[in-house]
Curated annotation (Swiss-Prot):
HAMAP family: RNase_III. NCBIfam families: RNaseIII. Residues 5-127 form the RNase III domain. Belongs to the ribonuclease III family. Its main location: cytoplasm. Its EC number is 3.1.26.3. It is an enzyme of class 3 (hydrolase). The active site is at residues 44, 116. Homodimer. It comes from Vibrio cholerae serotype O1 (strain ATCC 39541 / Classical Ogawa 395 / O395). The gene is rnc. This is Ribonuclease 3. Residues 154-224 form the DRBM domain. Keywords: Cytoplasm, Endonuclease, Hydrolase, Magnesium, Metal-binding, mRNA processing, Nuclease, RNA-binding, rRNA processing, rRNA-binding, tRNA processing.
Length: 225
């Protein structure tokens, strides 16, 4: 494996025996030849099962409707794209010239599809139990945060919808500082929003939590002045 790919597998928490499976999972159909859509089909089904099974175990008294809503939140495209950005997947995607020019490596749908394809690739490279363990590791924070009956839209989603409803550009999140040791880090994120003079700062124990904190603050400022 090349060093960059080693960096990716470290973020994924899984080292492939068949590296070609990972390469295939990262190959978009625009690149011509073999691509990741069959792996995506497989990974989509595995992800849905793993999350449904985990919700069933975690919430023994919750009804089917609430569990369905929670699962939909966890497996929807923008959640998967968020995961893809946490893995910096855009740096590894194999895209055709047209998609490269149009910024396909940043597109939610392409990132989400690649995450599902990687799940399918992990399953084929190992077994269902290993794929389940890896998926649950990726989703640990999200599973701890999600609650039945509550609004399933997180601050980043609500901020995105608020801006889209006003035909404004999407916010841009940038990590400006990381402090502390590997298992006790504090992330600082700047959130730039069109129409706001200065970036909004958020802090958290992970990049995602810092982004959510920044989005929450930005929403408060936009809605309450």
């Amino acid at each position: 494996m090349t060093p960059p790919m080693n960096k990716l597998t470290s973020k994924l928490g899984y080292t492939f025996k068949e590296t070609e499976l990972l390469n295939l999972a990262l190959t978009h159909r625009s690149a011509n030849g073999k691509h990741n859509e069959r792996l995506e089909f497989l990974g989509d089904s595995i992800l849905s099962f793993v999350i449904a099974d985990e919700l069933y175990r975690r919430f023994p008294k919750v009804n089917e409707g609430d569990m369905s809503r929670m699962r939909a939140t966890l497996v929807r495209g923008n959640t998967l794209a968020e995961l893809g950005r946490e893995f910096d997947l855009g740096d590894y995607l194999k895209l055709g010239p047209g998609e490269l020019k149009s910024g396909g490596f940043r597109r939610d749908s392409i990132l989400a599809d690649a995450v599902e394809a990687i799940i399918g690739a992990i399953y084929l490279d190992s077994d269902l139990e290993t794929a389940r363990r890896i998926v649950l590791e990726w989703y640990q924070c999200r599973l701890e945060e999600i609650k039945p009956g509550a609004s399933q839209k997180d601050p980043k989603t609500r901020l995105q919808e608020f801006l889209q409803g006003r035909r404004k550009p999407l916010p841009v999140y940038t990590v400006t500082n990381i402090k502390g040791e590997a298992h006790n880090q504090e992330f600082t994120v700047a959130c730039e929003v069109a129409g706001m003079d200065t970036p909004v700062i958020g802090k958290g124990t992970s990049r995602r939590k810092a982004e959510q904190a920044a989005a929450e603050t930005a929403l408060e400022q936009l809605t309450h002045g």
